[in-house]
Amino acid sequence: MQVKQDHIVLVLLALAFGGLAWLVVISTGTEGGEDSFMHYLFARYVPQHPANLLDHWGKPLHTLLLTPFAQFGFTGAKIYSALAACITAWFTYKTAQKLGLATAMAAIVLLLFSPLYFLCINSALTEITFALVLSAGIYLIVSDKYYIAAVVLSLLPFARTEGFILMPFIGIYYLLRKKYYPFLFLGLGVVGYSLIGYFHFEDILWVFSQNPYSDKVGVYPTSSHFWQYGDAYPLILGRPQTLIFVIGFISFLLAFNRASKTGISNAGDPFKHWLLIVVLALAFFFAHSIVWHFGIMGSAGLSRVFAGIMPLLALISARGIEAIYKPFAFNRNLRLALVCTVLFIVVEFVFQNHRFPVHLGPEERLLYKSGEWYKNSGYYKPGNKIYYFAPTVGIAYDVDPFDPSQRAYLDAAKNSENIPSGSIIVYDMHFGPNECKIQPEEIKNNPDYELLKQFTPEEPFTTLGGYNYEIFIFRRK
């Protein structure tokens, strides 16, 4: 019976991949905006710049897995995300099955059609790779394959930095389960990447010393509302699934209360596996709430980071489906109708609240427009050095962003005496005054620069920091 069900699930996932692939192909835009484009560029230029495979912001494991697909363009990178999502759904389903959930297949729908995760599939973002590694590791743990689980989970920090948040809790779980030898393999990823990176950075501690978020304070605003991510549930899980998730979480708390009376150490393996899943989800939630509240470690307060732990959230939601399902054990058809109705509402919520296919955002559209103007202007010269920050410029202006002869960061334009004559400066009101800390007047009023073109959207809108979005193209005299 289980083998037959697995075959059905594989067929359904193959169909899901086909549907997701079609959706990302017809979508010109992407979730994550500039971050998504930048992750694509890191992978796209790996053949020319192998050191990209060790870039901490790009995330080494994510860039490695994305590279073969990125050679086919940005759409190829999004195809990777669709494939990774379907593999993640398989691991999530198998984990639910191992945990004894009769409604394990529901976990696939709850994962793929949680609004945030569904949106992130149409991107080149690291959250998808993080979810893939996490789901594989959790599945291996519940399958009692602790050695290989440790190896897989040791790679989490190289998919996203939050891996360093989850690893201590995973390590404690291993020690409490007396898996002492497998515990040692949890450090394999850090050791391996430290040794590989040493030959490039000449720093055995590069994994920690080159963390791009360790001293990033003050770039983004802080929040006085600690529970911001809790309030973001309509985007993260969607309203229907949030209700199911709450039921699943309450079901776990009741099980925890029962286990605490007899001793948690005496509880069975399924409960201990559930405890790990819930603790990891809570650790992730509180860690992000803290760094956003205090404005540390480069937190921008983005809800999309929770796509990385969506397999955990989907499993808790699947537990909620199970709690709804069990009271109707007397009637198989009624159970099936109830579950199908709930899942239909979950899927419907996504398509009712989001438009598909996804088109380019207003910032990206204006950047592409400016790129078309530049390439058709008399100022365009192949290989000309361009100073910019917005990653979309690398695509729109046909620039290799990792070639220092073609590209430099916008903040370098502050010192005009160091800018070669004829160089182009692409200043946009998103990154210019925020990440680069340069006001447009600083360049406008500099006699060494001339303004070539100003791009203003037909329908004005504000960007990060409350600035009216515009693009200014300057040339160094």
Predicted regions and their residues:
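Hydrophobic/aromatic-rich transmembrane helices and adjacent perimembrane loops
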Residues: 127, 165, 276, 295-326
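Signature aromatic-anchored transmembrane alpha helix within multi-pass, membrane-resident enzymes
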Residues: 10-13, 187-191, 257, 263-266, ...
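Short acidic/glycine- and proline-prone juxtamembrane loop motifs at membrane-interface regions
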Residues: 119-129
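Transmembrane-helix motifs of polytopic, lipid-linked glycan transferases
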Residues: 76-101, 132, 136
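Membrane-embedded, lumen/periplasm-facing catalytic core of multi-pass transferases
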Residues: 47, 337, 341-401, 405-409, ...
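Specific aromatic-rich, kink-prone transmembrane helix
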Residues: 89-94, 110, 114, 129-152, ...
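Membrane-lumen/periplasm interface segments of specific transmembrane helices
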Residues: 38, 180-249, 281-288
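Hydrophobic, aromatic-rich transmembrane alpha-helices
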Residues: 89-92, 171, 237-278
